[in-house]
């Protein structure tokens, strides 16, 4: 009791650090403490505590877990001290019960002695009735015997009062111990409830952080996708702009070339008119003798000159075709590089590149056709205008210079396009590497999270699989305790009934002897003796009523235990279903096997006694053992119904009666 009183304030100093204690936790702790006299180690306590709380240990920081385990060690030490005190109290109660039994045996022996003395008095009173002359000395002997009987009755009364005081003292000690244990368990319940709330808050914060991180990753991925799409649109717009600029530049160059060709044609026409007039004048002057000579000389000269001009024009046309082919090859390279770079971007860029290639090819074909037409026209004009080649040489030289300028501009444009293509390729490679790094990081985080979740679920599954073995061990211990307590209660009840019957018989014999004495020798002392015997009988009746009241109180307690057990089973089933509805999608399929083990009967039930200060967790041994017997019988029946089950002996009538649910209501 002193250890309980000392450990009470230490347990009450931290009422806001633990969560609500569950019935399985207290059952495992106290059952282990009752079964093993050695102190529990930290590893066993951690395993038992983690088995009862598998989902809340992952969210507590390391410092909080260290403090929590230190507090758990202190509380377990206090609980072991309380269990030791309860064992000592149990031993004291057993010793007091043995002493009461010895005193009752002594009282019985004394009553037997008194009965034997009364019988001796009766035997002595009979010859006294036959011999009235010896009445006076025998009456004095009878008075002495009555005084001795009074003294013995006083001793019996004092022994009964001592027994009553001891019972009251033991009852008070038991109630005090129960109240202290109830207070300690209530405080521990409050502390554990507060810790459970803290852990739930921590779990919520952790889940919120995980959701925020996943949301941030999604936002980052969306932003990267938007940047990539925006970059692709910008690149496509730049290519379109440059394509439009190139087309405009080519169109302008072709228009300028066409204007120059028209100007050269107009100048040629003017020169042709002037030369025609000059030739007509000369033809008129030299129409005579020099006509044939001039024609021959002019024909030779014109043929040679025209051949040179045709060769120059052929070289210019070949250079122009070569330039056009180089331009086409460079454009084809650009298109091929663009097609390779944008192959992953979709068919839209490919279609655009194809259209651009077709457009450039059409422009090149148009340019080639225009060149061929121009060459044909130039050949036709050369056939018709052999004399006007000098003016055309200047125009051809001018065109060659312009073509050289164009050929000088085209490499610069191609180099710029190559540089821009390289820059775009570098940017795309950087964006691709960043995207791959972010994706790799997210995949690594996801794999790490999955690995942690699988490890945590594996640990939870192992702990949940170990729960049925622990519950079965506790059930076996409860069965042993119940069998011992039933044997003791039955033996004590039979002994008390036998003693009460013996006392009643002795009182009946004593009353009959007193009645005989009253009939033989009426007197004041006989009346006093009868009154004392009546008071003694009243005291015995009160003792019997007290025993009956204790029996009714025990029956009421057992009934309340049964009712509260059914309520606790219903609430436990609701909580298990709610927990499964919340945690079911994240729990593996293997944990379904551990679900029936969670719905097993609880060893502790709440006893809302009106005489107690606070609600108290009491050990319902009687109903627990009945439930365990019922469960064992049901398990045997289920094993018999299975196809591979081993056949056993049929249940006796006593076991069948134990299976009836009315036993939970009776006692």
Curated annotation (Swiss-Prot):
Gene Ontology cellular component annotations, sorted alphabetically: early endosome
Subcellular location, record wording: Early endosome
GO biological process, one term: bone mineralization involved in bone maturation
One family name in Pfam for this protein: CCDC154
Coiled coil regions, renumbered to chain: 76-182, 215-302, 384-410, 457-521
Keyword Iron-sulfur among record annotations: no
Keywords per UniProt: Coiled coil, Endosome
Superkingdom of origin: Eukaryota
Principal location class: other
PANTHER family: COILED-COIL DOMAIN-CONTAINING PROTEIN 154
Other information: Overexpression suppresses cell proliferation by inducing G2/M arrest.
Protein name (record): Coiled-coil domain-containing protein 154
Gene, per the UniProt record: CCDC154
């Amino acid at each position: 009791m002193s250890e309980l009183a000392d450990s009470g304030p230490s347990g009450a100093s931290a009422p806001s650090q633990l969560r609500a204690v569950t019935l399985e936790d207290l059952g495992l702790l106290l059952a282990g403490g009752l079964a093993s006299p050695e102190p529990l180690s930290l590893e066993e306590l951690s395993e038992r505590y983690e088995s009862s709380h598998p989902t809340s240990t992952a969210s507590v920081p390391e410092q909080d877990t260290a403090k929590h385990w230190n507090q758990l060690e202190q509380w377990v030490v206090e609980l072991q001290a309380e269990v030791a005190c309860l064992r000592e109290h149990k031993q004291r109660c057993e010793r007091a019960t043995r002493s009461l039994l010895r005193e009752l045996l002594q009282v019985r022996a004394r009553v037997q002695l008194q009965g034997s003395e009364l019988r001796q008095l009766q035997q002595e009173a009979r010859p006294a009735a036959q011999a009235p002359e010896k009445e006076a000395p025998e009456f004095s002997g009878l008075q002495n015997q009555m005084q001795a009987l009074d003294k013995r009755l006083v001793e019996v009364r004092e022994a009964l009062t001592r027994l009553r005081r001891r019972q009251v003292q033991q009852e008070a000690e038991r109630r005090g111990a129960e109240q202290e244990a109830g207070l300690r368990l209530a405080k521990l319940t409050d502390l554990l409830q507060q810790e459970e709330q803290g852990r739930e808050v921590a779990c919520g914060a952790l889940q919120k952080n995980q959701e925020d991180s996943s949301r941030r990753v999604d936002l980052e991925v969306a932003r990267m996708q938007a940047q990539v799409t925006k970059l692709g649109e910008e690149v496509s717009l730049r290519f379109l702009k440059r394509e439009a600029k190139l087309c405009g530049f080519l169109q302008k160059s072709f228009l300028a070339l066409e204007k120059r060709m028209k100007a050269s044609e107009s100048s040629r026409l003017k020169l042709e008119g002037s030369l025609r007039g000059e030739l007509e004048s000369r033809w008129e002057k030299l129409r005579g003798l020099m006509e044939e000579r001039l024609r021959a000389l002019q024909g030779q000269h014109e043929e040679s000159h025209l051949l040179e001009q045709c060769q120059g024009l052929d070289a210019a046309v070949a250079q122009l075709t070569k330039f056009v082919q180089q331009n086409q090859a460079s454009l084809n390279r650009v298109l091929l590089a663009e097609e390779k770079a944008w192959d992953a971007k979709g068919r839209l860029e490919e279609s655009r590149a194809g259209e651009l290639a077709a457009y450039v090819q059409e422009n090149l074909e148009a340019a080639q056709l225009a060149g061929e037409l121009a060459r044909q026209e130039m050949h036709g004009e050369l056939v018709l205008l052999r004399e006007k080649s000098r003016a055309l040489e200047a125009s051809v030289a001018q065109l060659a210079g312009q073509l050289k300028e164009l050929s000088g501009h085209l490499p610069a444009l191609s180099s710029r396009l190559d540089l821009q293509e390289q820059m775009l390729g570098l940017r795309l490679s950087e964006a691709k590497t960043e995207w791959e790094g972010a994706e790799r990081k997210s995949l690594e985080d996801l794999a790490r999270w999955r690995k942690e979740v699988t490890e945590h679920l594996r640990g939870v599954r192992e702990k949940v699989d170990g729960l049925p073995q622990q519950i079965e061990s506790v059930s076996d211990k409860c069965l042993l305790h119940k069998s011992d307590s039933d044997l003791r209660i039955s033996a004590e009840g039979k002994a008390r009934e036998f003693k009460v019957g013996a006392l009643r018989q002795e009182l009946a014999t004593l009353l009959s002897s007193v009645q005989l004495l009253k009939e033989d020798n009426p007197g004041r002392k006989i009346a006093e003796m009868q009154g004392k015997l009546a008071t003694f009988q009243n005291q015995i009746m009160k003792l019997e009523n007290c025993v009956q009241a204790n029996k009714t109180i025990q029956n009421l307690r057992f009934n309340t235990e049964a009712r509260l057990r059914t309520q606790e089973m219903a609430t436990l089933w609701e909580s298990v279903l709610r927990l499964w509805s919340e945690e079911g999608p994240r729990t593996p399929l293997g944990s379904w096997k551990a679900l029936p083990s969670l719905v097993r009967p609880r060893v502790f039930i709440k006893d809302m006694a009106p005489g107690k200060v606070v609600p108290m967790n009491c050990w319902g041994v009687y109903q627990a053992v009945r439930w365990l017997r019922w469960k064992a019988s049901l398990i045997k029946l289920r094993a018999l119904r299975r196809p591979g089950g081993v056949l056993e002996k049929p249940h006796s009538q006593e076991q069948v009666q134990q299976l009836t649910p009315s036993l939970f209501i009776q006692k």
